[in-house]
């Protein structure tokens, strides 16, 4: 017995003894790792001393979502305006204008989107709308948002429309202007009916040369104030996951003769179609077709260099531009000071921190862009300018340039771009790597992916299966109460039939629910809305507060570049 107890005690003590002898070594295998794979990480930050304020006037003025008209004057940026131009293209089913057509009316309608104002109380002011005929077609080569739009000086509406910022926009054109479209349809209508691919290019060109479209602008405020109005451009809306035609169209009504009978007939025109579409075919296939308006912007604020503040406005107005050469110079110096080689250095993270001070009027924060996206500006050999984003939108860890109200700053990441900048040696003479900040807005988009024909066929199949089950089995014999046909029998008009019916309808309902309208939120470049943001410039002397975690305590709240990099161990 004593021997058994002694053995048990020894066995119990053995794990303790074994564990007491275990040591963890972090050095084992160290000499087996390739030394070229070992890096030392460092984090440095430095103030950004040079920031240009440049107009983004070569952004394209074309928009496929809305038209923008209005004007705002504020004490910081002066006057900024929005005006819009677009074509009016006949829908496919409106081309037979009959004989001897007589003008009755020509009206245009747009649903309201949103408004932008510089100060409260301006949302419902009256604005005069001036509508002119375009004198030339809209160029697809010169697309800068600040470019002039050729238009006439004669008003083409009945009277001067007045808009109060509340409801949809409705315009009524003069008889003289409507007659131009009647004449165009009389001359070109018969040959425009064929809209097969490849056959309409010359027809469309002939049409827009005859009636290029319209141009809309508003009066400008004499003092501080004003409003910018946005209207939905698309003739397509989404309901139950299917596209349908809304009322964003122009309607030409004429009294004309068909087969000897005089009738009042309306003809539809789609704003901004870039070609002749077969709209009915698109709707049958539940496919969206695109429309475009050219939204022009003008600005008074001059370009210059940021000193105590950085000014950001909407449209093609002032945007901050940070020279890449400046960033590279500071980072290369930091790498060399730590014994590294810039060509072999890995950039782990690079962030541009742009702080701002809380304005006295907190409503001003609503005029800050929700996001300023870092981009680069590239010019092709033919002079075409394009902008490319620098943050990875698919990476949730990357800061896209969102407005951070808690830390009172924007802090977008440009990690991959900085890695490329380190390899450049020509930045003293080239500016294609300079960082431009553009205003971005979150847009909620309704998506239509349903197929009406497939759903109808599925419903038909379900009913066919149900009725086959209902009547194909005869009376179903005796069962329960009565003769199965109406009682609780088996496999007839009893539980079996109803059960199948409801199961099938449940499946059909499930399919239908899968085709309900879905919504997605996307980040899109916003050239239309009014923005007014004042950020801290390089000359600011305000010190950081403990509540702001992006900058070190007591650091100056100036634009700052923070970069984490790794250099190979020696």
Region spans (language model):
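Secreted, disulfide-rich extracellular signaling modules
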Residues: 2-15, 21-570
């Amino acid at each position: 017995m004593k021997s058994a107890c002694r053995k048990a005690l020894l066995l119990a003590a053995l794990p303790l003894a074994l564990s007491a002898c275990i040591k963890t070594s972090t050095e084992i295998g160290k000499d087996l790792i390739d030394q070229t794979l070992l890096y030392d990480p460092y984090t440095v930050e430095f103030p950004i001393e040079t920031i240009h304020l440049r107009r983004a006037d070569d952004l394209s003025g074309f928009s496929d979502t809305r038209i923008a008209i209005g004007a705002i004057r504020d004490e910081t940026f002066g006057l900024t305006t929005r005006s819009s131009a677009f074509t009016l293209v006949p829908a496919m089913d409106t081309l037979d204008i009959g004989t001897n057509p007589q003008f009755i009316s020509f009206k245009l309608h747009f649903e309201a989107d949103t408004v932008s104002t510089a100060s409260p109380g301006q949302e419902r002011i009256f604005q005069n709308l001036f509508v002119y005929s375009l004198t030339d077609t809209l160029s697809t080569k010169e697309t800068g948002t600040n470019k002039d739009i050729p238009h006439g000086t004669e008003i083409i509406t009945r009277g001067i429309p007045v808009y109060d910022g509340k409801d949809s926009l409705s315009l009524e054109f003069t008889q003289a202007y409507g007659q131009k479209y009647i004449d165009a349809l009389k001359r070109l209508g018969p040959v425009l009916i064929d809209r097969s691919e490849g056959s309409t290019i010359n027809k469309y060109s002939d049409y827009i040369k005859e009636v290029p479209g319209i141009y809309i602008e508003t009066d400008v405020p004499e003092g501080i104030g004003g409003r910018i109005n946005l209207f939905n451009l698309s003739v397509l809306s989404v309901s139950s996951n299917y596209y349908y035609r809304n009322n964003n169209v122009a309607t030409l009504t004429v009294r004309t003769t068909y087969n000897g009978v005089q009738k009042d007939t309306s003809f539809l025109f789609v704003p901004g179609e870039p070609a002749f579409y077969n709209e009915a075919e698109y709707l049958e296939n539940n496919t969206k077709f695109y429309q475009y308006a050219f939204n022009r912007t003008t600005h008074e604020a001059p370009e210059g260099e940021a000193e105590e503040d950085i000014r950001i406005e909407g449209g093609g107005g002032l945007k901050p531009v940070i020279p890449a050469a400046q960033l590279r110079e500071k980072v290369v110096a930091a790498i060399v000071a730590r014994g590294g080689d810039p060509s072999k250095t890995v950039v782990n993270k690079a962030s541009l921190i742009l702080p701002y001070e809380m304005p006295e009027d907190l409503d001003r924060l609503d005029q800050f862009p929700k996001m300023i996206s870092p981009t680069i500006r590239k010019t092709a050999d033919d002079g075409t300018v394009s902008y490319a984003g620098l943050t990875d939108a698919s990476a949730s860890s990357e800061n896209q340039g969102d407005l951070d109200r808690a830390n009172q700053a924007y802090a977008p990441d440009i990690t991959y771009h900085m890695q490329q900048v380190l390899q450049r040696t020509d930045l003293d003479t080239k500016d294609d790597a300079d960082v431009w900040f553009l205003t971005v807005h979150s847009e909620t988009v309704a998506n239509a992916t349903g197929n009406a024909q497939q759903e109808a066929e599925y419903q038909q199949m379900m009913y066919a299966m149900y009725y086959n089950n209902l009547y194909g089995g005869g009376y179903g014999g005796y069962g329960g109460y009565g003769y199965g046909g109406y009682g609780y029998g088996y496999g007839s008009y009893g539980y079996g039939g109803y059960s199948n019916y409801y199961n099938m309808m449940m499946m059909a309902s499930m399919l239908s629910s899968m085709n309900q309208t879905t919504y997605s939120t996307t980040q899109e470049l916003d050239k239309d809305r009014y923005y007014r943001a004042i950020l801290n410039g390089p000359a600011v002397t305000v010190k950081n507060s403990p509540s702001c975690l992006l900058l070190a305590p007591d650091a100056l709240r100036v634009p700052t570049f923070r970069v984490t990099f790794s250099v190979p161990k020696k």
